[in-house]
């Protein structure tokens, strides 16, 4: 039985000063090997071009593999303790990952990559989602 997540989204911005392939590789550090990464063109605060790289993982085994890697690499107890702040109004858990570390093939808490995991909760109430997420992150 898989973890109680509908899907996991990963997103990173690639700024004009960054190599897009390097940012893709950073995402691949967290993603399953065959995950498709989509690119969308955007514009930064000052009008500079930005490429938004994103991927969605929906298969249970792949979601489990992502969380297994997170458990091995980051302070998962900290994430679990901070769930109340990390869970949004749509019952999605957010975890920021260090883009520079991921570019080196490592996974660490930080900034640059946003992981969003939509928690299964029936009924779709915050308390149920928190309980399910806490259990999943053990």
Report each predicted region and the residues it spans:
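A common structural junction motif
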Residues: 30-35, 73-77, 113-116, 137-138
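Short, charge-patterned binding micro-sites
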Residues: 37-62
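Glycine-rich, aromatic-bearing surface loops/beta-hairpins
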Residues: 95-138
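Short amphipathic alpha-helices in soluble, non-transmembrane regions
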Residues: 23-28, 66-74, 131-133
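Long, hydrophobic N-terminal alpha-helical segment
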Residues: 1-37
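Mid-chain, well-packed structural core segment of small domains
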Residues: 67-102
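Short, conserved charged micro-motifs
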Residues: 18-22, 61-67, 125-130
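Beta-strand elements of well-folded, non-transmembrane domains
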Residues: 12-16, 31, 59-61, 99-101, ...
